[in-house]
A protein has these predicted regions:
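Extracytoplasmic/periplasmic solute-binding protein
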Residues: 11-68, 84, 113
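Short helix-initiation/N-cap motifs at beta->coil->alpha
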Residues: 8-14, 95-109
Length: 316
């Protein structure tokens, strides 16, 4: 792999993976992934489809375009075609579908693959456990005709709290204050494994060169997506009434990794059943008193090449 001229498009990436695999002769491959974890596979395929313009949003979030979900959109199928092409080329490590993410990370560190999709926590792990490993980070490759969106993420929702029945709420509060203090967060960032949510900490304390590259690329290619719950808090009542359809998106990717090529039909079935489940969830939420409709899950002013801002919610 020419590290000074990394593949930028799907075709270029596929060709490089093929070259690596052929040169490896069974010892190493172009790509490896933690294919046993279907949630990770869903994150990856959603990201790739968003680069193709699907507006599929972050994992666990339903977004609609023209009143329909995008699980079988042209962009989603393009993303599956890309993954399937890598599989048909033999470029995926043969153990991929049976590996958890830490196992894939370890095999990558043993030079059994040239590329994998994982998070920033790999950086400090490799530097500590595999000090001789030469590695770097790169942007996700985009469709040959250019990116039509960015890598999707949504703003963090509150996920830590103190129970009202806690015997020591003051102590719990002090713990949370300490956890998110600059003193503690600076150490986490300096260690090179994580990005802080506290304003200014990353810029001030991030020292690791690879981590800085990761942070820069994430800011450039990642795009904040609209969150229906931010637009209307009552949208949460819909999620509470939804039962996940099986096989889900990640499971369909998993099947593709084993060589299955009938994903178009499976995606059509997933999209159809998801639409029914979603419309039923909206109906149940409305019957329970929630002021919510299908329009709360569609954002016609969403440009997936840009961050979706508070002002965009107001002008939806």
């Amino acid at each position: 792999v020419d590290t000074e001229n990394l593949p930028k498009t799907w075709s270029e990436f596929r060709e490089v993976c093929k070259q690596v695999t052929e040169a490896g002769k069974g010892k190493y491959y172009g790509m490896i992934e933690g294919g046993k974890q279907v949630n990770r596979l869903e994150i990856a395929i959603r990201a790739l489809s968003c680069l193709a313009g699907s507006k599929s949003n972050d994992i666990g979030v339903i977004s609609m375009v023209d009143g329909k979900n995008v699980l079988n959109s042209d962009a989603m199928i393009q993303a599956f075609d890309f993954y399937s092409g890598l599989v048909q080329d033999g470029s995926f490590h043969p153990d991929t579908v049976n590996l958890a993410a830490p196992e894939a990370r370890a095999l990558f560190a043993q030079n059994q693959a040239a590329f994998l999709i994982q998070g920033s926590w790999c950086i400090s792990t490799w530097e500590k456990e595999n000090p001789d490993l030469e590695f770097g980070v790169m942007e996700m490759p985009v469709p040959d005709d250019g990116a039509k969106g960015g890598l999707p993420y949504i703003g963090a929702q509150p996920w830590m709290g103190i129970s009202k029945t806690s015997d020591n709420p003051e102590l719990a509060a002090k713990y949370l204050q300490g956890l998110y203090s600059e003193e503690y967060q600076s150490g986490v960032v300096e260690d090179g494994g994580f990005v802080s949510a506290i304003k200014g900490v990353n810029e001030k304390y991030m020292k690791d060169g690879v981590m800085k590259d990761y942070y820069t690329l994430a800011l450039e290619q990642g795009k904040l997506c609209p969150d229906p719950i931010v637009g209307n808090a009552d949208a949460s009542a819909v999620y509470a009434n939804i039962t996940e359809i099986s096989p889900n998106l990640g499971q369909i990717v998993q099947g593709t990794l084993t060589g299955k090529t009938d994903y178009k039909d499976t995606l059509n079935t997933l999209a159809e059943n998801t639409q029914k489940e979603w419309e039923n969830g909206i109906k149940k939420a409305q019957e329970a008193g929630a002021e919510v409709s299908a329009e709360d899950f569609e954002f016609k002013n969403w440009n997936p090449l840009e961050d979706y801002t508070a002002e965009d919610y107001q002008n939806k």
